[in-house]
Regions:
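Conserved PLP-enzyme active-site core in the AAT-like
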Residues: 2-7, 14-222
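Buried hydrophobic packing segments
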Residues: 10-18, 234-239, 393-399
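Low-complexity, serine/threonine/proline-enriched polar segments
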Residues: 39, 46-85, 227, 286-288, ...
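Short, flexible/disordered intra-domain loops and linkers
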Residues: 84-88, 245-252, 306-313, 373-388
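Active-site C-terminal subdomain of aminotransferase-like
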Residues: 173-289, 403
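Short beta-strand-to-loop capping motifs
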Residues: 187, 298-302, 366
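Conserved small-domain helix->loop->beta segment predominantly found in fold-type I
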Residues: 244-358
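PLP-dependent enzyme catalytic core of the Aspartate aminotransferase-like
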Residues: 349-420
């Protein structure tokens, strides 16, 4: 296990592993739906700074090359949606992935294939069956990295990826509901052996310290001594959430997720201004709670035009107002009560609308705490707790409908968000 300050930082780690024991081969990185992963992932995937500062406090230039990484790394993007924002057929996606891997390997390049489990809107690709075929065909010429940063995945799935010699990226801050900026990479033994030789790219000293790497990782000896203690504490909190979640019976996990889905669909149906995105359950082998949909993206019809959906800028404005106490702008007690609530949901994802523009898709998702509970729920019976949670979920959509109906007034005063 190697700890990283975020899922994007772990992307640098995955690329660095492909430079060991030396960087003798040019690299092709294949990313799936980069618009549905972290915004900095495409830059990190080719060895470039993805922000203006780093986990170790270095000031850097965004998109500038990071020292020690090959400058000729090639990026290939495979979209998971068509120009209308609709998920592409799995067969088309997997054919494109297979062709991209084969073309890069034929050109004498080392290939890093990034599987996505899951995207910001709940998409999974490619299938485990394709990953097995690619591993059998290309062997050590192919590195597989699984972006499981959503952590909407059970331990048996993670084990199956590791058995394919895939590096699995995880975080503690999304499904697990731990503090933000807690990433890690799970490295299978065959890949971990690379850490015994060579040297990691020199520029990683801006992102990692020795304490985040196993003591046996000789390739990390050039990193600064010490550790990111804030990262360690954030993971301690996330692991506490994981332990409580793991203790919940599997059938109960599935029951709660199905109840959440029904609550989302009911809340959306109460208003005619929402469009719920159609996404299938994750196509996994076998059943289990992680084969159920837990992320629900929705769009909002624009004020004054039921034929148009909010674009990303307007959706982001609405997202900020959801996180603001807007009660002062309303008159009736009911409206003031709804407007006062702070509603924190998933930030909008920009997807194409088929006409050259984009739609901002907001998201609600089930987290581990919905299933396992948290300290403020102590003393509540499970059904009563869930009824309260589903009531809060319905209120999110009620507040959106209220804000939309007073859009011009809100735009005039623009209440500021306060995250608490």
């Amino acid at each position: 296990v190697v700890l990283a300050a975020s899922g994007t930082d772990s992307e640098l780690l995955a690329l660095a592993l492909s430079h060991l024991p030396d960087a003798g081969q040019p690299i092709t990185t294949i990313l799936l739906a980069p618009e549905e992963t972290g915004s900095g992932v495409p830059m990190a995937a080719v060895g470039r700074h993805f922000a203006i500062d780093t986990a170790n406090g270095h000031d850097v230039s965004r998109a500038a090359p990071i020292g020690g990484f090959r400058p000729d790394t090639e990026l290939v993007s495979v979209p998971l949606r068509d120009k209308y924002g609709i998920p592409r057929p799995a067969t088309d996606i997997e054919d494109e992935i297979g062709c991209a891997v084969a073309a890069a390997a034929a050109a004498g390049r080392r290939v890093i294939l990034h599987a996505l489990d899951l995207s910001k809107t709940g998409l999974l690709a490619p299938s485990m069956a394709l990953l097995r075929k690619l591993r059998a065909r290309f062997g050590d010429a192919l590195d597989i990295v699984v972006d499981a940063c959503q952590m909407r995945i059970g331990p048996s799935r993670i084990r199956a990826y590791l058995d394919l010699d895939a590096v699995v990226q995880i975080t503690g801050s999304k499904f697990l509901t731990g503090p933000p900026f807690a990433g890690a990479a799970l490295i299978p033994p065959r890949i971990a052996r690379r850490l015994g030789r060579g040297r990691l790219p020199s520029g990683l000293d801006a992102y990692f310290s020795r304490g985040e790497w196993p003591p046996s990782a000789m390739a990390a000896r050039g990193l600064p001594e010490g550790a990111n203690y804030g990262l360690l504490l954030r993971w301690r909190a996330a692991l506490a959430e994981l332990r409580v979640f793991a203790a919940v019976p599997e059938a109960r996990k599935s029951d709660v997720l199905l109840r959440f889905r029904a609550a989302v669909e009911a809340a959306v149906a109460r208003h005619d201004i929402f469009v719920l995105q159609t996404v299938a359950d994750p196509a996994r082998e076998g059943g289990g709670w992680d084969a159920l949909r837990s992320v629900f993206a929705f769009a909002v019809r624009a004020p004054g035009s039921m034929d148009r959906l909010l674009d990303p800028a307007a959706a982001r404005q609405l997202y900020h107002w959801l996180n603001a106490d807007c009660a002062a702008l309303f008159d009736t007690g009911r409206d003031r009560s709804i407007a006062a609530r702070i509603c924190h949901i998933g930030q909008p994802v920009a997807l194409p609308d088929g006409e050259g523009g984009q739609i901002g898709w907001l998201r609600v998702s089930a987290g581990a705490r919905l299933i396992s509970g948290e300290p403020s729920h102590r003393g509540l019976a499970t059904d009563r707790r869930l009824a309260r949670e589903m009531g809060d979920l319905a209120l999110v959509f009620d507040k959106i409908a209220l804000l939309r109906s007073h859009w011009d007034r809100l735009a005039q005063f623009d209440p500021r968000p306060r995250y608490r």
